[in-house]
Amino acid sequence: MSQLTLTLLMIVAAYLAGSVSSAVLVCRMRGLPDPRSQGSGNPGATNVLRIGGASSAAMVLFFDMLKGALPTYLAYLMGIDAISLGLIAIAACLGHIYPIFFGFKGGKGVATAFGAMAPIGDDLAICLMASWVVLVLISRYSSLAAIITALLAPLYTWWLDDRFTIPVAMLSTLIIIRHKENIQRLLKGEESKVSRKKRPKTP
């Protein structure tokens, strides 16, 4: 099989994997409202945290990251070049954003993009996660943390393993474009902050 054919097959596989909406499935399994019609309307871990609590959000985060990590890492093991790895990672994110199995209404792609970047190295994964966590703790805005972390990701990659700077920059660009509406709401002071689902008070 030629390298081009293998790359195209992996792009299709990555898109299909990304199209499995972890947020919708976890919410169905746990008897929670559809995240596409509750909270922010975004089927991602942050919105599931709002409507279903930390454990449900953690499950969504794990599976969304896995959707990006698996196809990208498998393609890396197959010897696919760095730019093509970036295209495969983007395909996984596009599957998450526009899922064919869920009416093309998906999330922002942040966790899936992070999952695709994480196999580059533990040091990069730690830098990305630490940046996002610190920014959320400071600002309480998940979207702002994602945008700034996406801007930092190519710089971290260039510093730690410059072979993958261009693919990571491609992913970061997609994430920032996907957050266009969030950026507008942030500028207007209308963006929702991160909050947990409140537990009912016991009598």
Swiss-Prot record:
Topology in the lipid bilayer is annotated as:
Multi-pass membrane protein
**What EC numbers are recorded for this enzyme?**
2.3.1.275
Instruction: Look at the named UniProt entry and state the broad enzyme category this protein falls under.
Output: transferase
Mind telling me which GO cellular component terms the entry cites? plasma membrane
Q: Which GO terms describe its molecular function?
A: acyl-phosphate glycerol-3-phosphate acyltransferase activity
Q: Where are the transmembrane segments?
A: 6-26, 82-102, 118-138, 141-161
**Is Transmembrane included in the keywords of this UniProt record?**
yes
Q: In which pathway does it act?
A: Lipid metabolism; phospholipid metabolism
GO terms under biological process? phospholipid biosynthetic process
Domain of life according to the entry: Bacteria
Q: List the disulfide bonds.
A: none
Q: Where in the cell is it found?
A: Cell inner membrane
Which keywords describe this protein according to UniProt?
A: Cell inner membrane, Cell membrane, Lipid biosynthesis, Lipid metabolism, Membrane, Phospholipid biosynthesis, Phospholipid metabolism, Transferase, Transmembrane, Transmembrane helix
Could you tell me what reaction this enzyme catalyses?
an acyl phosphate + sn-glycerol 3-phosphate = a 1-acyl-sn-glycero-3-phosphate + phosphate
Protein purpose: Catalyzes the transfer of an acyl group from acyl-phosphate (acyl-PO(4)) to glycerol-3-phosphate (G3P) to form lysophosphatidic acid (LPA). This enzyme utilizes acyl-phosphate as fatty acyl donor, but not acyl-CoA or acyl-ACP.
Annotated family: Belongs to the PlsY family.
Q: How does it assemble?
A: Probably interacts with PlsX.
Identify this protein by name: Glycerol-3-phosphate acyltransferase
Q: Which gene encodes it?
A: plsY
